[in-house]
């Protein structure tokens, strides 16, 4: 029982005698179940579950969690069933052990799929009972401590998985001590040489800093004693992985990171925190822009503290965190601080526990709308390490977003419907680009319009997984709706004098059956997406090719499909020729892209008369309602200010420039290629006339192909 005694010493500090006895019984079952089994390192297997349970006991977790930790491998590795555990220890312990075991049982085609699906399963188990992930994190820690016994490739894989998933999860749940240990062990296993070198230089640097650390410590402590503010002042050392990350991601030099002297001041009440802040600011010159109040507005993982940055003795940077004892516990243990497990409840609990519960609920929504495990893991990873900003709604509600979030992210954070109908934003009462990042303290107002729909381009700049998932969801629906609408138009056009509604039901049923397509909507969607040709389907539906429209022989406008330019995401204007209203146009259906419109003179569609079935006669309607992009080439003298004059002239015509490039022809001349917006050929002719009046413009022409 000597192994159990090491766990008992910690657990008896907060568990009752009957609970310790119940824990001992769990240990005996686990010990007997693992009899004769050893770890990769050669040590008896039972050492591992005891180490896991001890980590959780140090976090003061409840009896059921400690029992499940001792038993977490018995279902997987031994002849013990979930029913056995239920009979001996109750359903709660059995469910916890089963939840942890299931994460390791899954079999997949490849390692990448396994990691993605395992992660999805882990998150779902965590949403059911957060203790599952606490056991999993505690399980990972001793595994990382004993990595030395594994093959180098396996060691690297586990270390990378730990740094990418488990350490960020511990951070997101606010469990600082586990997060720090996992990062250090993962860093050492993945990059042993970098770890060793960095450890040596950090050790040397810390030795040189002792005198300055002692001086700042004494000055802060002395000032607080002078004014009668009892406090505990401790120096903070950055861990090696944190230093390495800053050097890599922020491209900071080693001495820049090590030159910062960091301290933590722990006091009794939140009110004292602010009084201490005033005293340290009177001692050293503060940097106002670097002051952060995480007490009034806690971080996403429940972390609370005042952060301030100051200029210390001899100009050295001094960083101070000020917090209460409770906040210090929370910063170290996160959701496990003041542990009291309440199933499916947000009522009560610490800030960290409530925020974790909300976060996990949002993960459940992500899982339900994600297309697959890879999409899910991509979305959740973006939420694991958020540097937060805090912005306000016009009514003063605080909205917490990750750093880099845009007005679109804000809109979806407020409500899905607001995000879906967003057409613009005002920040601090001023128009603000949807793609531009927000900053803390801004007041954001979303301009929405009924009937507006998400834009696929938003996916290029949103940063929250919620926004990304909701946008993809709507785009999938839009794509289907648009493909059905376009498919109906294409089929009606191919049917000539007939329409889809006139086709006999038995004909439709036969075609659907022959093609193994479930419904008419699916058939229309396949036509709209270019997977089936409308002319072929029309022939099969009618059974009489003579009644069909022949696009190549129809000179009259009545057989041309009208184009407005706003048909949806399944109508594309070809980039090779940039057609605009009043151009003679031709179209073809491209698989997956829908209808692609070209100018008739475009080299890419020159052979359309030879393959009439692949092309469709189209024409512009009179009520097109958008701007179109086209391309101009301008030959100019190489003179200072000529390019600026060109862009100014284009701007005055009401056109926007979407792209611009230059090509030097010789020392005196160059050609400017401009992508710009225009309403139609008349508008474009006006733009070209204005350019021709420029003194440095020699020739302006529209790109032919």
Swiss-Prot record:
Catalytic activity: guanosine 3',5'-bis(diphosphate) + H2O = GDP + diphosphate + H(+)
Xref: SMART domains: HDc, RelA_SpoT
GO molecular function, one term: GTP diphosphokinase activity
Domain HD: 45-144
Pathway(s) it belongs to: Purine metabolism; ppGpp biosynthesis; ppGpp from GDP: step 1/1
Function: In eubacteria ppGpp (guanosine 3'-diphosphate 5'-diphosphate) is a mediator of the stringent response that coordinates a variety of cellular activities in response to changes in nutritional abundance.
Family affiliation: Belongs to the RelA/SpoT family.
Protein name listed in UniProt: Guanosine-3',5'-bis(diphosphate) 3'-pyrophosphohydrolase
Organism expressing this protein natively: Vibrio cholerae serotype O1 (strain ATCC 39315 / El Tor Inaba N16961)
């Amino acid at each position: 029982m000597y192994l159990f005694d090491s766990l008992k010493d910690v657990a008896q500090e907060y568990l009752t005698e009957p609970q310790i006895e119940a824990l001992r019984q769990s240990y005996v079952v686990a010990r007997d179940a693992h009899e004769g089994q050893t770890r990769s390192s050669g040590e008896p297997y039972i050492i591992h579950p005891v180490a896991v349970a001890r980590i959780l006991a140090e976090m003061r977790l409840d009896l059921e969690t400690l029992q499940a930790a001792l038993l977490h491998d018995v279902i997987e590795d031994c002849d013990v069933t979930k029913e056995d555990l239920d009979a001996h220890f109750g359903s709660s312990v059995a469910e916890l052990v089963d939840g942890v075991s299931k994460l390791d049982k899954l079999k997949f085609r490849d390692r990448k799929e396994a990691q993605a699906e395992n992660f999805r399963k882990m998150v779902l188990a965590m949403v059911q009972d957060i203790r599952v992930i606490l056991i999993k994190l505690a399980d990972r820690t001793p595994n990382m401590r004993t990595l030395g016994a594994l093959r180098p490739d396996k060691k690297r894989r586990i270390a990378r998985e730990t740094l990418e998933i488990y350490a960020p999860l511990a951070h997101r749940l606010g469990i600082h001590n586990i997060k720090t240990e996992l990062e250090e062990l993962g860093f050492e296993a993945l990059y042993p040489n970098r770890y060793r070198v960095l450890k040596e230089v950090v050790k040397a640097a810390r030795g040189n800093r002792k005198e300055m650390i002692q001086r700042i410590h004494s000055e802060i402590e002395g000032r607080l004693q002078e004014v009668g503010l009892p406090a505990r002042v401790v120096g903070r050392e950055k861990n090696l992985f944190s230093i390495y990350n800053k050097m890599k991601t922020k491209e900071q030099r080693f001495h820049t990171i090590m030159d910062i002297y960091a301290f933590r001041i722990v006091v009794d009440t939140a009110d004292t925190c602010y009084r201490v802040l005033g005293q340290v600011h009177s001692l050293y010159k503060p940097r106002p822009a670097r002051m952060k109040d995480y007490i009034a507005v806690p971080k996403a993982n429940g972390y609370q503290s005042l952060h301030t940055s100051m200029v210390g003795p001899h100009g050295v940077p001094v960083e101070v965190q000020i917090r209460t004892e409770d906040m210090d516990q929370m910063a170290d243990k996160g959701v496990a601080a003041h542990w009291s497990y309440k199933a499916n409840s947000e009522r009560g609990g610490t800030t960290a526990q409530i925020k974790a519960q909300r976060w996990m609920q949002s993960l459940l929504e992500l899982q339900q709308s994600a297309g697959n495990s890879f999409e899910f893991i991509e979305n959740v990873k973006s939420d694991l390490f958020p540097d937060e900003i805090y912005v306000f709604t016009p009514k003063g509600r605080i909205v917490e977003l990750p750093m880099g979030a845009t007005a679109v992210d804000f809109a979806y954070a407020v409500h899905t419907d607001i995000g879906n109908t967003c057409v613009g934003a005002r920040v601090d009462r001023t128009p603000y680009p949807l793609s531009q990042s927000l900053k803390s303290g801004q007041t954001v107002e979303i301009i929405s319009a009924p009937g507006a729909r998400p834009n696929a381009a938003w996916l290029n700049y949103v940063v929250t997984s919620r926004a990304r998932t909701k946008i993809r969801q709507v785009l999938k629906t839009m794509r289907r709706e648009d493909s059905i609408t376009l498919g109906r138009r294409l089929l009606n056009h191919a049917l000539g004098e007939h329409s889809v509604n006139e086709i006999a039901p038995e004909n439709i049923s036969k075609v659907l059956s022959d093609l193994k397509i479930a419904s008419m909507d699916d058939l229309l969607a396949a036509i709209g997406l270019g997977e089936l040709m409308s002319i072929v389907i029309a022939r099969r539906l009618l059974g009489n090719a003579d009644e069909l429209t022949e696009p190549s022989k129809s000179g009259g406008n009545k057989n041309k499909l009208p184009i407005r330019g706003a048909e949806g995401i399944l109508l594309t204007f070809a980039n090779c020729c940039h057609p605009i209203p009043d151009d003679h146009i031709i179209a073809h259906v491209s698989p997956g892209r829908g209808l692609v419109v070209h100018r008739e003179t475009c080299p890419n569609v020159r052979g359309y008369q030879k393959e009439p079935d692949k092309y469709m006669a189209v024409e512009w309607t009179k009520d097109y309602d958008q701007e179109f992009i086209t391309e101009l080439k301008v030959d100019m003298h190489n003179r200072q200010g000529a390019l600026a004059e060109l862009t100014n002239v284009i701007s005055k015509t009401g056109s926007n420039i979407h792209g611009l490039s230059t090509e030097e022809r010789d020392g005196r001349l160059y050609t400017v290629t401009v992508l710009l917006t225009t309403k139609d050929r008349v508008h474009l002719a006006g733009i070209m006339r204005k350019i021709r009046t420029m003194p440095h413009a020699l020739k302006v022409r529209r790109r032919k192909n």
